[in-house]
A protein has these predicted regions:
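Gly/Ser-rich oxyanion-binding loop with an adjacent helix/lid
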Residues: 1-19, 28, 37-40, 73, ...
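C-terminal nucleotide
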Residues: 1-26, 51-86, 181-258
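N-terminal cofactor/phosphate-binding cores enriched in small/glycine residues
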Residues: 31-33, 46
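Short Gly/aromatic-enriched secondary-structure transition segments
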Residues: 38-45, 222-223
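Short, charge-rich binding segments
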Residues: 43-45, 53-56, 101
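A short, structural micro-pattern
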Residues: 46-48, 173-176, 197-200
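A generic structural motif
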Residues: 47-49, 59, 115, 177
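Residues at beta-strand starts and edge strands
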Residues: 48, 104, 108, 200-202
Length: 258
């Protein structure tokens, strides 16, 4: 039986994919606005995924389609891929191709089950599933840590979102039944058992109705406040900040920085 994703790919592009991959969204248990301050975070992967199917082309053309956009593809020139090229949602997969320095054409079909704008890292799931697939298809030999950093680079430098490294790390390195303790100063990780069923517990993910947008939301402002506060206090990042040091410098900080 043909995989449903392969069927969608074939219907859109007229051929079977060379390779398929998927990566999950995530929930963070603790550590908000900490990853870009080099602190500790404790996310875990969820059972909602973004899947990709890809196929090599020999003409330097990149065609990208999504089941969330009526399976119609957009066409790009691989030689033109650099920050500023492409618009909207297509900048995410284009950014991954740019970060991984891909110079060959591709057909890419994306099937996302992670709700967009829900704070579950749909963008990281897209980036990581595609980065993993490209790494396998082109035999790049990149580690999962490398792929996380390259996916973050795509979002930071191509899409223009100053996200930290947490979302990409858990999407690529998460494991069922575990949370992942990430030290964002060096990306060292520790699997932490999270067997909720055995403890007779359930963790609820509730839709608050508030749309989460990293590109035009308050995320960039919050990160800028953290970085400017650290600079004023004289530390490399907020991770190095003690409660006493923060209190002693309150008069030098704006309300948002404090």
């Amino acid at each position: 039986m043909t995989h449903p994703l392969a069927e969608k790919f074939a219907k859109t592009f007229g051929a079977q994919p060379d390779l398929m991959a998927q990566a999950p969204g995530r929930v963070n248990l603790i550590g908000e606005h900490i990853d870009y301050s080099q602190g500790f975070v404790l996310p875990f992967a969820i059972d909602l995924y973004t899947s990709v199917a890809i196929r090599k082309r020999n003409d330097g053309i990149v065609r990208i389609a999504s089941s969330q956009r009526n399976q119609n593809f957009e066409t790009f020139e691989v030689s033109e891929i650099k920050p500023g090229y492409g618009t909207g949602w297509a900048k995410y997969p284009l950014g991954v191709l740019w970060a991984l320095e891909i110079s060959e054409g591709l057909d890419i079909f994306i099937d996302g089950k992670v709700p967009s704008g829900a704070g579950l890292s749909s963008s990281a799931a897209l980036e990581c599933s595609l980065a993993f697939a490209i790494n396998e298809l082109f035999h790049l030999g990149r580690s999962l840590k490398d792929l996380a950093l390259l996916s973050q680079k795509a979002e930071n430098d191509y899409v223009g979102v100053p996200c930290g490294i947490m979302d990409q790390s858990i999407s690529l390195m998460g494991k069922s039944g575990f949370a992942l303790l990430i030290d964002c100063s060096d990306l060292s990780t520790t699997l932490v058992p999270l067997d909720l069923t055995r403890a007779d517990l359930q963790l609820l993910i509730i839709d608050t109705g508030v749309h989460h947008a990293l590109v035009d939301g308050g995320y960039a402002e919050r990160r800028a406040s953290c970085e400017s506060a650290a600079a004023k206090i004289g530390v490399a990042s907020m991770r190095q900040l003690s409660a006493a040091l923060l209190e002693n410098n309150q008069k030098n900080l704006t309300n948002s920085e404090f």
